[in-house]
């Protein structure tokens, strides 16, 4: 579910190209999905809104495993309530169809911290989905590095447009971004990884670094050296103004919601990925983030 989004479209193409699975892509606008025609016999496109219980139930009929990639931050209304309602509707449809396994991509963040509304919603969605299916694998990730990722594109646009980066003092908070290809590999392996109970699996790239360092690292990869100035306080309205000026409007709207999460460390704190995805974990250890750009 959510096949027309950034991760959804990449995952769909990845599955078709690297596996022999039959894929059913469910989203509001299947006409937006781009794929190689040679895989058309293994791909079924279904138009369904996540709030349409009957349509989702039909889309889940005969499915062995589903991937849930929905977020509502770009929609009108309170996204926390919308995401909860969407998860409830999908969960009920999954239970009705007898779905045995569900994969969900959520966000990192310690449940014991005072989390942003964005991260609270991500975690709440996982709790709701878990209550409806026999087995939920909830991945928690920070920024996914790849063209089309909203967080990544916002950072890229700011670096390209602003020679001086004014960032708040809490930009020293650490994050652990993961490359798109690695996130896709985790999602793909999770479809068949042997598990008997639900798990929260935190995933990240090989390095922890601050948001300030992330900006500097990306800038260096494109031959730039911006002046990065830490300031004690950057009001949310000022950050929103910058986003509106230098990023696409839809990205800016979502970015304003995500910006609140920058005060929360988004790093891997458990080692479940080592237990269930050992080969992928060891592969990641050999990488450096500079290769991700």
Map each language-model feature to its residues.
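N-terminal Rossmann NAD(P)H-binding glycine-rich loop of SDR-like oxidoreductase domains
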Residues: 1-21
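NAD(P)H-binding glycine-rich loop region in Rossmannoid oxidoreductase-like domains
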Residues: 31-35, 39-97, 107-114
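Conserved beta-loop-beta element that borders a ligand/cofactor-binding pocket
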Residues: 127-150, 154-161, 166
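Mid/C-terminal beta-alpha module of Rossmann-like enzyme folds, strongest
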Residues: 186-256, 265-293
